[in-house]
Each structure stands twice: as structure tokens, then as C-alpha cells.
């Protein structure tokens, strides 16, 4: 099976193609990319691998949470490709994708949500098998959710910004911090593979907008100026 994966939910834009057991990944600073530039990069990558769009068996994308604009771009491109080829599409939770990047079976995924807030989810991980312990949520860094792990790794862009608040809130946990932004398209492709279903419904793969009123709120602010 050959799967195209796109993630533009964070500061690193990544594109991946899973071809049998081999993953090819390309990364770019997301600030320099937009929807008009991504498609040519996808085409160039497929050309390097001698793959045509008609060879794809499915499309996956980082469904969020994360950058509202980035998620919208990735989902739009993924839907366009899936719809035109009539192939399955799968959206993968970016907090879950982060959790699979570490060896520790207890993970707290933490993504900087901007606007002085953070997205957090807690997971138990065994290879690519994920059990949700705390559902993903949007929090102020001073009012973080209770998480009852004895030890855990905290991973994601939110650690870079809010390490002190996280350390204070979870001082009862033996913590390992990973302060780094990750590209996720590769792991998203792997997570999407078992979810690809020939009896698919394009409407089932929806973006995860935890802060679902952000665009409207910004518009209202601008209108009031």
C-alpha cells in the first residue's frame, strides 16, 4: 500500500510517502510554505520515487490540534486528492502522533496553542498502539489538567514555552522533558495505514479544531477595531 501523508499543524511542514515498508519524508519551515507551494513539493517528491497520483492507495493528514490555518491547508489538500482519486482519507490526532515518537509508554503530549494557551493529551503507548488517558484539551498554562502518572515523558512544542509551568504542575511525576518541535508526516502515515478502509466515507476524516471559534473570534476582534 502507498500512502501520502501531509502535516502542516506546527512550525515544521512535512510530507511523507509510505511505500510498502519504506517512508520518504521531506521537511520545510511552515512559515515559508502555503497551499500553492505544497502541491508542487508533493509532485516533486512523488516524481523522485517514481510514483503517480494514480498509484496512491490513501491519503493521511495531521488533523490537529495545532495551527488553525495549517490544519485547514493540510485537510484541504488531502481532501482534494482523496476526492479526485476516490481513495480513503484518514485524519490523525497530532497529540497522539507525538506520543508515538518516544520509548516511554507514558506520554504527555503538549503543543503550544499560541494565545498563551497549550494543547495537552495524556497517553499510554505500546509501539503504535495508543490508549488515551486524558482526552485532548486546551488549557491555560497556569490551570493544567490533573494527570496521574508515576513517570512520563512530556513532548512537544508546548514544552519549549511552558516547561516551568509543566514542571510545577506535574512535580509528583518523574518527568523527562523533550523540548523540540517535530515533523509528524512520517508517523502519521504509519498510524493511518491500519485505518485505511475501502468502505470509506470522505466525511469521516474531520479536522480537530479544539479551539473551534478561533477564526470567528479574530474576525470579531478585527471588526471591532
Task: Enumerate the predicted regions with their spans.
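N-terminal beta-alpha supersecondary unit
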Residues: 1-63, 182
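Residues at secondary-structure transition points
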Residues: 29-40, 68-72, 76, 93, ...
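Surface "functional belts" at beta-alpha junctions
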Residues: 30-33, 88-181, 209, 214
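Phosphate-handling active-site elements
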Residues: 48-54, 83-94, 200
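Glycine-rich phosphate-binding loop signature in dinucleotide/nucleotide-binding domains
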Residues: 49-54, 147-150, 196
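DPxDG-like acidic metal-binding loop motif
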Residues: 58-88
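Acyltransferase
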Residues: 176-225
Amino acid at each position: 500500500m502507498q500512502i501520502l501523508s501531509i502535516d502542516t499543524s506546527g512550525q515544521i511542514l512535512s510530507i511523507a510517502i509510505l511505500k510498502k515498508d519504506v517512508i520518504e519524508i521531506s521537511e520545510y519551515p511552515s512559515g515559508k510554505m502555503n497551499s500553492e507551494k505544497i502541491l508542487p513539493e508533493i509532485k516533486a517528491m512523488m516524481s523522485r520515487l517514481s510514483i503517480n497520483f494514480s498509484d496512491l492507495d490513501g491519503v493521511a493528514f495531521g488533523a490537529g490540534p495545532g495551527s488553525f490555518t495549517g490544519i485547514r491547508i493540510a485537510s484541504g489538500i488531502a481532501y482534494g486528492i482523496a476526492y479526485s482519486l476516490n481513495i480513503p482519507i484518514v485524519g490523525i490526532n497530532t497529540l497522539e502522533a507525538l506520543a508515538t515518537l518516544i520509548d516511554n509508554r507514558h506520554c504527555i503530549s503538549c503543543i503550544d496553542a499560541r494565545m498563551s494557551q497549550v494543547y495537552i493529551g495524556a497517553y499510554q503507548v505500546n509501539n503504535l498502539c495508543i490508549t488515551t488517558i486524558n482526552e485532548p484539551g486546551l488549557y491555560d498554562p497556569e490551570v493544567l489538567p490533573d494527570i496521574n502518572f508515576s513517570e512520563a515523558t512530556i513532548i512537544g512544542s508546548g514544552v519549549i514555552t511552558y516547561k516551568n509551568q509543566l514542571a510545577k504542575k506535574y512535580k509528583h511525576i518523574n518527568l523527562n522533558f523533550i523540548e523540540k518541535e517535530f515533523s509528524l508526516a512520517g508517523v502519521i502515515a504509519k498510524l493511518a495505514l491500519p485505518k485505511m478502509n475501502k468502505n470509506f466515507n470522505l466525511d469521516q476524516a474531520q479536522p480537530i479544531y479544539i479551539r473551534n471559534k478561533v477564526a470567528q473570534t479574530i474576525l470579531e476582534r478585527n471588526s471591532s477595531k
